[in-house]
């Protein structure tokens, strides 16, 4: 079986010219429904049967996406062995993503924290993008044709928007970094315009623009995380490390697609590994930030309780002092009242009036 390792190729036509000259043609690609492909898998595989003698093959590729064409000609037994390992990796990836989604969904329902909501939206968007990028999404049916190709690029633009919105809440830019907040808001507005620009600029330009948008967006968000981290906020370290790992995986995948690395077939695997690490680190960062907020709230409550205890102690002290002062003073005033009722000469009465005067 001839295995093209890139599932986003629109249309592949393979002509097989065996030694007897009997021309045969096979067709596959993501524009064909799964039931119409020669092999019903997410990649556009083409089964071939080698006849004795010289076999010639002509392959024509027509696609609107990046032309990445890693080819492997393997036996069915070797292919089955490779698919076992690949299914294990893909199952682990989707298991991690779904596990993080439901874990953070539980936290969102418990805490009602907006950052968790936007993490869930980001998780879903990233899941749909990866599933469409590696062809898994279309195993369950797809529109086919140009619409299916454009959906992938729409998900790339929505990724830029949702990632920025999540970053605003995660990094607290509205309250801590007003200038960065304005930059991220402007970035979201620009990405929203790009998202709806397909009818104006066409699919080819839309494809190029989506790739550039993801690259520029990732760099801006990484720089934002570094700025927050350097400003002394601990959660910025989780954010920076998460986006750094994602960028490294994207760079490795790009180098693979350009043929600059030896293992040219592992590009999608690197992206999945980077996305998994990013989502895990962002989830840890959210948990750390919530824990830090709870510690700050607990410290504030302890300070408020301490201040209340000090006020209560001061009030008790004043009440005790007032009681201790008023008790002998009341005795003195009573004696003065008794003296007023006794016969006094003029001088004694003057002294008594002098004492009673301030009272």
Residue ranges, per PLM feature:
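Soluble non-transmembrane domains of integral membrane proteins
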Residues: 1-88
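Carboxylate/His-rich catalytic cores and anion/metal-binding grooves
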Residues: 11, 117, 128-129
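First transmembrane helix
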Residues: 84-108, 211-227
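Interfacial "cap-and-anchor" motif at the non-cytosolic start of specific transmembrane alpha-helices
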Residues: 128-169, 173-303
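Residue-level marker of regulatory loop/turn positions in helix-turn-helix DNA-binding domains and
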Residues: 233, 310, 344
């Amino acid at each position: 079986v001839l295995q093209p390792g890139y599932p986003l190729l629109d249309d592949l036509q393979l002509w097989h010219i065996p030694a007897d000259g009997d021309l045969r043609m096979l067709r596959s690609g993501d524009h064909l429904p799964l039931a119409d492909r020669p092999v019903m898998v997410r990649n556009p595989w083409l089964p071939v049967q080698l006849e004795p003698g010289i076999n010639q093959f002509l392959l024509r590729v027509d696609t609107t996406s990046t032309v990445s064409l890693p080819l492997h000609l393997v036996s069915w037994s070797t292919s089955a062995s490779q698919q076992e390992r690949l299914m294990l990796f893909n199952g682990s990836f989707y298991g991690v993503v779904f596990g993080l989604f439901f874990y953070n969904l539980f936290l969102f329902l418990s805490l009602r924290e907006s950052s968790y909501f936007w993490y869930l939206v980001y998780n879903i968007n990233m899941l749909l993008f990866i599933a469409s990028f590696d062809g898994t999404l279309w195993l369950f049916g797809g529109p086919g044709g140009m619409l299916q190709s454009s959906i992938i690029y729409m998900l790339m633009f929505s990724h830029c928007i949702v990632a920025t919105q999540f970053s605003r809440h995660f990094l607290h830019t509205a309250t801590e970094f007003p200038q960065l907040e304005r930059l991220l808001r402007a970035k979201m507005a620009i990405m929203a315009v790009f998202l709806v620009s397909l009818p104006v600029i066409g699919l080819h330009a839309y494809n190029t623009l989506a790739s550039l948008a993801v690259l520029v967006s990732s760099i801006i968000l990484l720089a934002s995380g570094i700025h927050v981290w350097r400003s002394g906020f601990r959660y910025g370290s989780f954010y920076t490390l998460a986006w750094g790992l994602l960028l490294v995986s994207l760079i490795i995948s790009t180098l693979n697609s350009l043929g600059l690395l030896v293992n040219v077939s592992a590009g999608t695997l690197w992206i999945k590994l980077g996305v998994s690490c990013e989502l895990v680190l962002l989830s840890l960062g959210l948990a750390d930030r919530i824990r830090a907020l709870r510690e700050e709230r607990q410290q504030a409550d302890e300070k408020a309780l301490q201040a209340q205890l000090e006020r209560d102690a001061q009030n008790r002290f004043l009440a005790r002092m007032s009681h201790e002062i008023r008790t002998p003073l009341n005795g003195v005033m009573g004696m003065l009242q008794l003296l007023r009722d006794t016969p006094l000469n003029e001088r004694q009465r003057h002294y008594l009036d002098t004492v009673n005067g301030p009272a």
